[in-house]
Amino acid sequence: MSRRKRTGGAAPPPAGDARAAERPALRLVPTTAGEDRAEDHPSRWARPNLRSVVIASGKGGVGKSHLAANLALALGARGARVLLVDGDLAQANLDLLLGVHPRFDLQHVLRGEKSIEEVLVPGGRNVTLVPAASGVPELADLDDYRREVLLRALGQLEADYDLMLIDTASGVSRQATSFCLAADDVVVMTTPEMPAFSDAYGLIKLLQPQGLARAPHLMVSMAASEEEAEETAHRIRLVARRFLRLEIDSWGWIPYDPALPRALRRQEPVLTAFPQSPSAAAYRALAERLWETPGGEPERTMPTTPERLQA
């Protein structure tokens, strides 16, 4: 994907928020003035400063959790305060990727045994992990009430963070859909392989009529080259435009990199285990585009997502 530098004015911090004036600003798609998405969707988070980004995929094994963990660390290294949420409630793995060992997790919150603050785990580099459980069948399919409890619990943490980054379960579970509908931005990950391509489009097709805050973004991983990644993204965007009347922008691509499974075996993020690897460089470049540094350099912004085409 081309990496163009764009310039533009950052929104001023709220009056009286000295911390907001001192820290950089996340440069995703700007929120429409006066827009109140919480009224449009009862489970949507309503907060002035925190941005929420969900990383989703139609199938497993596309590098979604690697993106969540390493992007969180790369943004944290640039000064962002990141709340990293393991949204795969029954098959959690972000703790393994970060090399941390939580004592409590979201199952304890949902059972009323712990508050959301009590399960937080430092993940390094300004990153705080909200861990989930693994191998707990009751968390695989939460009822509506417990999903709402979970979303509201996460919303209580908004004042202490700049970004909530959520790694959802793969596929089209109700949990994953709920996270997507509650967030500001949804990133759909795919690989150039046809099954992943097909499932990514299927996920977009499922989410599109349900009321996303805006059109999803696309991320291609495990690509052999930039050309292969661009071709994959182009095909999905073309199909979405033709059949869903939906314009999708691209976040970029992550190259195929043997360092990723090696880092996982070491229970370390690739950013720290192999900082000179191609994938680590790609995660840092993505963080640089997402997070502007005050003074000196031009702002780096994500491309503005076009509005949905009118029927």
Indicate where each model-derived feature is located.
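NTP-binding/hydrolysis catalytic cores, primarily Walker-type P-loop NTPases
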Residues: 265-311
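Extreme N-terminal, non-catalytic leader segments
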Residues: 1-62, 80
